[in-house]
């Protein structure tokens, strides 16, 4: 029932997304047809969590700030309805235990053979740069054995103004090739494998998004 509702909501929402923003989506052949998988994406705007479920062919679940469930504006009501429809997991960013709980929830989703999306940066980029990734996606991959699918979003930060008015711009969703945890020497400790995976995940996201990394030196600096 939940899956039918998910795809029913997506069927309703997708035409409006295409009408208003016309996202360019590439690399969908990299999404596994079955089994659990991890979507690891850069994060430019709150609407990213709206764009990914609409753009990708299989159902994905993800974590989102719990404050998005408490906004009283019309936009907040719409977001809450959508996040409930896609079974998003609310996270209290101030509580470390909630972060661990979200990863554990993600692990259970992956073991059920479903998709789980995560933003390795931990929060959206307010300056447009790609910030260092935390190891959540890598932890999920090591613990579940599921592949990580890197995704690069571009232009979503320009979709809405502070007043909620749509802005025009080019939006792209680029899906990269799967990163397999099995490709890393299993004799290495989990900690080393997580660090190696995390580095590769962020490298692939950077290539797909075209973002400059936070802290990277520019020419002449």
Q: Which residues does each PLM region occupy?
A:
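A conditional alpha-helix N-cap/helix-loop micro-motif detector
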Residues: 21, 96-100
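Helix-to-loop junction immediately C-terminal to a conserved catalytic motif
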Residues: 11-43
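Short hydrophobic helices that act as membrane-entry/anchoring signals
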Residues: 2-21, 80, 84-87
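Catalytic core of membrane glycerolipid acyltransferases/transacylases, capturing the structured
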Residues: 33-96
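Non-catalytic C-terminal accessory region of glycerolipid acyltransferases
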Residues: 4-5, 35, 100-221
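Short, well-ordered coil/turn elements that cap or connect secondary structure elements
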Residues: 18-20, 57, 83-85, 143, ...
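Structural motif corresponding to alpha-helix initiation and N-cap regions
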Residues: 25, 76, 100-103
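A secondary-structure boundary/capping signal
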Residues: 27, 64-65, 87, 119-121, ...
């Amino acid at each position: 029932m939940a899956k039918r509702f998910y795809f029913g909501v997506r069927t309703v929402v997708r035409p409006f997304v295409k009408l208003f923003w016309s996202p360019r989506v590439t690399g969908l052949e990299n999404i596994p047809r079955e089994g659990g998988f991890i979507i690891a994406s850069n994060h430019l705007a709150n609407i990213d969590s709206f764009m990914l479920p609409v753009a990708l062919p299989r159902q994905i679940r993800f974590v989102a700030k719990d404050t998005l469930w408490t906004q009283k504006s019309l936009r907040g009501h719409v977001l809450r309805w959508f996040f409930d429809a896609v079974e998003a997991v609310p996270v209290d960013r101030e509580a470390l235990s909630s972060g661990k709980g979200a990863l554990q929830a993600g692990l259970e989703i992956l073991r059920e053979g479903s998709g789980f999306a995560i933003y390795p940066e931990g929060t959206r980029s307010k300056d447009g740069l790609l910030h260092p990734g935390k190891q959540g996606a890598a932890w999920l991959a090591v613990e579940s054995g599921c592949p990580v699918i890197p995704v690069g979003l571009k232009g979503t930060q320009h979709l809405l103004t502070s007043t909620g008015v749509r802005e025009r711009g080019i939006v792209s969703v680029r899906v990269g090739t799967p990163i397999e945890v099995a490709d890393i020497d299993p004799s290495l400790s989990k900690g080393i494998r997580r660090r190696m995976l995390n580095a590769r995940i962020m490298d692939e996201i950077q290539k797909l998004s075209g973002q400059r990394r936070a802290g990277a030196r520019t020419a002449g600096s």
